UniProtKB/Swiss-Prot annotation:
The species this protein was found in: Mus musculus (Mouse)
Gene that specifies this protein: H3-5
List of residues that carry Allysine: K5
Protein name: Histone H3.3C
Residues modified as N6-succinyllysine: K15, K57, K80, K123
Modified residues (N6-(beta-hydroxybutyryl)lysine): K5, K10, K15, K19, K24, K57
Annotated positions of the N6-methyllysine modification: K5, K10, K19, K24, K28, K37, K38, K57, K65, K80, K123
Family: Belongs to the histone H3 family.
Modified residues (Citrulline): R9, R18, R27
Compositionally biased spans, kind Polar residues: 1-10
Modified-residue entries (5-glutamyl dopamine), positions: Q6
SMART domains: H3
Positions bearing N6-lactoyllysine: K10, K15, K19, K24, K28, K57, K80
Signal sequence, start to end: none
Length: 136
């Protein structure tokens, strides 16, 4: 986000600062004895942008192998029982699935940007799929 220059404005009056009570002044000036330091937090969006750059650079699979394998076996169970899979077959399915999902999210992001938003919503996914011709 670009920094904007702030111009000085003439004051139009207002309330004069009141004198602080003695107890308030001593409370403010006394150092805190707790010494508990707040954990460092990045500004909203900083970590998200860092993750975007990290995942765009990388080529590794993003979905864990075993949960994906269980999902494939569960879906295949509906069509035929006692199916066996080569590990290369599940690897190929995972590569194709992740490539499809990444492409769908790219198109979904474009739909959100077109609607002047930065947050993707289910309606963006539906629009992206409809434009692709996957769902009428």
């Amino acid at each position: 986000m670009a920094l904007t220059k702030q111009t000085a404005r003439k004051s139009t009056g207002g309330k004069a600062p009141r004198k602080q009570l003695a107890t308030k002044a001593t409370r403010k000036s006394a150092p805190s004895t707790g010494g508990v330091k707040k954990p460092h937090r990045y500004r909203p969006g900083t970590v998200a942008l860092r993750e975007i750059r990290r995942y765009q650079k990388s080529t590794e699979l993003l979905i864990r192998k075993l949960p994906f394998q269980r999902l494939v076996r569960e879906i295949a169970q509906d069509f035929k029982t006692d199916l066996r899979f080569q590990s290369a077959a599940i690897g190929a399915l995972q590569e194709a699935s992740e490539a499809y999902l990444v492409g769908l999210f790219e198109d979904t992001n474009l739909c959100a940007i077109h609607a002047k938003r930065v947050t993707i919503m289910p309606k963006d996914i539906q629009l992206a799929r409809r434009i692709r011709g996957e769902r009428a």
